[in-house]
Every structure is written in C-alpha cells, then in structure tokens.
Amino acid sequence: MKTELNNPRDKIKVVTMNGSLMPLNKAKVSVTAPGLSYAALVFEGIRAYWNDKLNELYLFRLDEHLVRFANSMRLLKFSDFPETSIIKEDILKNLKANNYQEDIYIRLQGYIDDWGEMAVQTPVSTSIVSYPRPRAVAFKEGKNFTVSSWKRLDDNASPPR
C-alpha cells in the first residue's frame, strides 16, 4: 500500500536476507519466528550521507554500529550469529546494488528465525534494508533545547526504562 507519491520504498532495488540479495517482495519471515512472535530481535539504524562534490556515499561510524549490534545479540544470548566482518560486507554489497546517490538510512536486524519459544537462541537470521532518508531539517536550521531542573527517578524506585 502506497501512502505517498514519492515513497522511499520505490527506490529499493534489493534487500539482504542472510547474506543474499533479493527483491523486497521476495524477503519473507515466518509468522512463527520468535523474532516476530516474541520480539526476539536486535537492530541498528545506520546513516549514510551522500557527498555531491565527491560523488560518494559515506557511512557514519559503521564499525561502532556493528560492535554494538554484535554486543546486543550476545546480550540476548543469540547463538551462531554472523561475524561483524561478514555483516559489513553484506551492507556494502547492499548499498552497491541499490546504487543510491542521496542520504540513506540502513536498518540492520538480527532475529531468531524459523520456529520456537521465547527462550530459543538459534537460528539467527539477519536482514538489511536501506532506503533514502533525507537529513532532518534541524541539520541546517539548528534546534533549541531547554535543560530541565527535574531529576530523573532512580531506577530502583520505579524502573521507568
């Protein structure tokens, strides 16, 4: 279902599932996958910025994102997930195949696939979806903030997080 005339989804040539490039409409996750049923997943949102002068796309802190992604999967006790070097290659292949020449957003996900209960740790699948997303207006115009005098509740009093 299209919601607007220039839907960014229309510019996606391929997505990546478990290292394989494929059209968006061919990428499927089972409704029985714990990643869907129990939110047994982790994700990273990664930005890449197009430089018109150099005709190049620049990824923002990719290595740091990948370390955080792997740490998140370890925290959830996922087993047998791909090395960050493999995921990095997959991201670069995805960007090359889509051939974006504008600012983009990359959504990297790792999730428990197939079938199982909440506590299963495998099989781990990954997906990479990249699509155009312009910089926020505040990037050029700036933003105003106020520093509050309120103190946050202690986590032991009433865990708000």
In which residue ranges do the predicted regions lie?
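Short, acidic/charged, Gly/Pro-enriched secondary-structure junctions
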Residues: 87-115
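Helix-start/capping segments and mature chain N-termini
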Residues: 1-79, 86-93, 117-161
